Amino acid sequence: MKRLASILLAAAALGSCSKGNDTPIVPTPPAPAPQIDYIAKIEEFEQGNPNKRYEISFSYDAQKRLSSFVETYPQTTPVQVIKGTLSCSDEAITLVYEENMSQEIFVKPAEYRLALDAKGKASKLQETHHYAGGEDIHAEKDYSYNDDGQLVSSKPWYYDATALTWQNGDMTKVVYSYSYLGVDQSRTDTRTYTTTTNRSYPDLNLFLATTAPTTKTKDLWSDQLGLRSTHLLSSFTEHFSHSGSTTKKTFAYKLDAKGRPTEVALSDSEGTPRTFIITYLEK
């Protein structure tokens, strides 16, 4: 009886293991890759003027990584053309940028190097300008990110500190601290947003916040720098405490059938209203 009981217990154990193993294991499906709207070209016009003021075109490699861009200023004589070339590795992204070559004091293009950590987030942004007598090197560093990978503070070379506020996936405020005539001061940027999702690359929000002409490089690296907002920018207000001055820009969009902004109307409290026409890599 004892032997039979042992056999029955063993059989029961085997049966329960088999029953458990027969249950299919359904793997968790991978999260869908985020949709990206790759920009091929941005053209800028003064509203009411058919003559183009500025153009920037972007080129990508086979992996859809940005490989180069060309800026054109059609209203200059001769027409000014500025090229930027990018190279990528796991450790850094480097931009060779000819922005300063129109000035005779520079002997070669500027270099912007974005160092990356093991997670692919920015750890340092260094820019180098080459003069006949040497180099001028500046660095932005001490990046700190929240749990969502959004930048919350940094140490730029041109300010003492930067603090960023996020709400519902959008960067709503940036405070830059600095000293002016021995007194602590601040520049405060506040942003509001539309309900339209921002899928643009380069990041249209950062491009518009600095406004053309001339790229400021961060629109190229918003994901690595933790600067991408979920929605498209509606307004951008800049206030300086030392002067009390405030400027404001507002943005209105026309979208195509895919929900991509193809035209942006910019109203500027200090400048001429402008229109940006956007062309995408994929039609």
Show which residues each predicted segment covers.
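C-terminal motif of bacterial Sec signal peptides marking the signal peptidase cleavage site
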Residues: L14-S16
